[in-house]
Amino acid sequence: GLVGACSTGIGLAVPLIGMCVTELFGLDRAAWGFSLDLVVIFVVTATFATSVWFGLEKGIKRLSDWNVALAFALLFFIVLMGPTLFIVELGFEAVGHMLQNFLRMSTWADAAKTSSFVESWTVFYWAWWLALGPYMGMFICKISRGRTLRQMILGCIGYGTLGSVVFFAILGNYALYLELNGIYPVLETMNSAGPPSAIVGVLTTLPWPKLVLLLFTIVCLIFAATSYDSSSYTLAAAATDELPPTAHPARWHRVFWAFLLGLLPITLVYLGGLKPLQSAVTLVSVPLFAVIILLTLSLYKSLRADAPAPIRSAAAAD
């Protein structure tokens, strides 16, 4: 399940990175086609294989820290050079709208079948998160050693949510501003050429488009790599017999899983489109329902076993 979920993530990132490369170097996307996708997959796989070879501190952590700095520099540039007031105001409106309609949107099943959004996206993302759940839990526990459960939960939910809100608010609102003001036909480009072309088109409307696109390509490449170097690390740890809590899996084992994760996306990208990727995630997530239930029961038993016994007062004892 984890191999399928991670491979799908790489498969989703490859078309976007490939489109950025063709725009940067003036290549013909149609002429290069699948060959360019293979090159991108190889570069991404080689990057996170190198990262996982150096381990948590020297590889994964260092690469992640660099990329966070680059990503926030890119976001700050968009806010500064774009419609700053529009981005900020619409961002606050969007957060308020989500909070007001969270329950309704979370339980919307589209019983009247007015669109295919629920089947195409809501179920797809739920299945993807379910498939990634065991790996994320194992990896977060590994890097959170020494922290309390409260710190770990608040850190994952708080920082993860905040990062998503900031990215959607800045990049999404800037694209919406271009569409509403007739500066760039975002929707038309998405429908005719696909989301990667629309994203590249939006970025090229900024000042110094080549520099912005180069930075965005690097950020996408490293984000893809840092997402899956942790996957290969976790897979190697799970496949190692009797690995002590403070020990690390063998380097060759980590690199083996890294390159194995890079093989499946080749097939998915070759099939083309989002449908094969969505179908793959939905399929691999089904067996993990039972795994999630067992993990939940195991966590409950562990917490009960580790919880300190209640202290009875002298008055209560009498």
Language-model regions, residue ranges each:
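Loop-to-transmembrane helix boundary motifs in multi-pass membrane proteins
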Residues: A31-A49, W53, T122-A131, M152-G194, ...
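Membrane-water interface regions at transmembrane-helix termini and the short interhelical loops
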Residues: M19-G26, V44-W66, G82, M136-L149, ...
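Membrane-interface interhelical connector segments
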Residues: Q100-S115, Y174-K210
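Select transmembrane alpha-helical segments in multipass membrane proteins
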Residues: G1-V3, L38-A46, L70-M81, A112-S120, ...
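Hydrophobic alpha-helical segments and their helix-loop junctions in multi-pass secondary transporters
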Residues: C6-F25, L38-V39, A73-A109, L171-L176, ...
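Helix-loop-helix connectors at the membrane interface of multi-pass transporters/channels
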Residues: A13-D37, A71-F77, G137-R147, Q151-L162, ...
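Helix-loop-helix module between adjacent transmembrane segments
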Residues: G1-P15, E23-V52, M81-T84, I218-Y228, ...
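Membrane-interface loop-to-helix entry segments
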Residues: G1-G4, T8, F54-M81, L90-Q100, ...
